[in-house]
Amino acid sequence: MYAVIKTGGKQYRVAAGEKIKVEQIAADVGQEVVIDQVLAVGNGAEIKVGTPLVSGASVKATVVAHGKHDKVHIFKMRRRKHYQKRQGHRQQFTELQIVAIAA
């Protein structure tokens, strides 16, 4: 069984037992999180697609860790004007362990 969930402005295809990295969630490590924004649920050849959400469906997950992705380097330059700007960014994430999918 799998589900397509929406969290942090992105969509993820998840199944029970998987680990995924999502945008940072305000939850402690070890805490259980319920994601109720389920866009689709599939079980073999049977697929249930919501308009836009599947009513009554939810995904339970446990917070495994918090961290930061690799650094992204930004470099801006204006040719012939002696202007250079360097900047870096590390996006924070939360790693989730999918426990169960309820449809």
From Swiss-Prot:
InterPro entries per the UniProt record, alphabetical: bL21-like, bL21-like_sf, Ribosomal_bL21, Ribosomal_bL21_CS
Keyword RNA-binding: yes
Molecular function terms from GO: rRNA binding; structural constituent of ribosome
Superkingdom in the source lineage: Bacteria
Family: Belongs to the bacterial ribosomal protein bL21 family.
Function according to Swiss-Prot or TrEMBL: This protein binds to 23S rRNA in the presence of protein L20.
Keywords: Ribonucleoprotein, Ribosomal protein, RNA-binding, rRNA-binding
Subunit details: Part of the 50S ribosomal subunit. Contacts protein L20.
Keyword flag Ribosomal protein: yes
A Pfam family annotated for this UniProt entry: Ribosomal_L21p
GO biological process terms, semicolon-separated: translation
Protein name according to UniProt: Large ribosomal subunit protein bL21
